[in-house]
Amino acid sequence: MSGSMEGNAVSFKGGVFSPYLTTRLPAWAGVRQNVMGSNVDGRPVAPANSATLTYATVGSSVDTAAAAAASAAASTARGMAADFGLYNQLAASRSLREEDALSVVLTRMEELSQQLQDLFAKVALLNPPANAS
């Protein structure tokens, strides 16, 4: 889309061929939402806020590949969101690793506490209290 400013009016030359840009506007802006559109070749274009998340492109094969990748990613994300078992398994293994690390830290702290008590006992033997005569 290109535009030029002439006085107080804006003149647009070209067009926007993406339903994504228009469907992001609020309904009160006069934009039709969830309405099947078409591209410049007349092929149907689903709106960006539809459940299919498929886009027809008017550009190069790179645009087609990008649209296919975006659609596949959205489909995968929906599938992962529906599969709670995957998330539970990942969360369980992470919590087990965290518990193992915490157990190692607690064991080391107990060892250090014991060493500190031994050191206090040795210092007490070397430096008896002054009032114990």
UniProtKB/Swiss-Prot annotation:
Which InterPro entries did the record assign? Answer: Hexon_assoc_IX
Molecular function terms, GO-annotated: hexon binding
List locations, semicolon-separated.
Answer: Virion; Host nucleus
The UniProt record describes its induction as: Expressed in the intermediate phase of the viral replicative cycle.
Coiled-coil intervals in this record?
97-127
Signal sequence span per UniProt?
none
Superkingdom, natural source: Viruses
> Has the keyword Coiled coil been applied to this entry?
yes
Q: What else is known?
A: This protein is only encoded by mastadenoviruses, and may therefore play a role in mammals tropism.
Share the domain note from the entry.
Three N-terminal domains of hexon-interlacing protein form triskelions between hexon capsomers.
Q: Which family does it belong to?
A: Belongs to the adenoviridae hexon-interlacing protein family.
Q: Which protein is depicted?
A: Hexon-interlacing protein
What are the top taxonomic ranks of the organism? Viruses, Varidnaviria, Bamfordvirae, Preplasmiviricota, Tectiliviricetes
Gene behind this protein:
IX
